[in-house]
Amino acid sequence: MEAGIVSCLKDCYPTFALGQITAGEEVAPDCVIYVEDDSGKKCVEAMLHHYRRQADPLVAQPTIATVPLGGFSQILEFVDKTPQLLPATTTIRMMLDEDVRLESLADYEARQDHYMLALFNRLNGQIRYFPWTPETGLMDLLRANSATHENGLKRYFNDQRVSWPASWPPAEVPGTQAQRRRQAKRDMSTLTDHLQALIGRSNDRVREGLFDYLVQQSAMNPALNILGLISQTIH
């Protein structure tokens, strides 16, 4: 009600309505997104930020909580066994790294791991996948055109001191996909420490910026459909 006039708001999200009724009483979010780790959390939050910049500012958006829970199997078992922790009005989603879809599921099928296959099948409607594994996606992006992305990060951080470490980017080390992921984590850690020393921002803020840059660049590739992915996740 405003100025004595009562108006109806159609199709609003539950927490918007409850917030008006409870006048500040804490309520559950409209959507909870479980991710594997802090890297996944930073990527989801960057995707949400990008989505909200594109959304109609006059349309109410859902409240979102992004929660790191550990390995993907722990996430699946947690969601499967504890659905009662959140009210029915809260949408539960899982955003898993690309390697789960490409490697882990194939491995379960090859080994006929019926328990894990049944778990994936039960929760399939709630599972979404990043178009990359965060650290690997970032390193692949930077390695593909290092000069362009060095300049891109100068603009992103608004700091001309941004530059690559010596002998950067490192050559991709041949090996298994698991070895590539571990190497990507080490390479990103080296880059993060280097940029932290150069521009004087916290390690966490630099990591957040690098993943936000990854999401921004990925959103420019229609094949990755970043906006569609996050929209389908939260609605």
Task: Describe the residue ranges of each PLM region.
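Terminal low-complexity/disordered tails
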Residues: 177-235
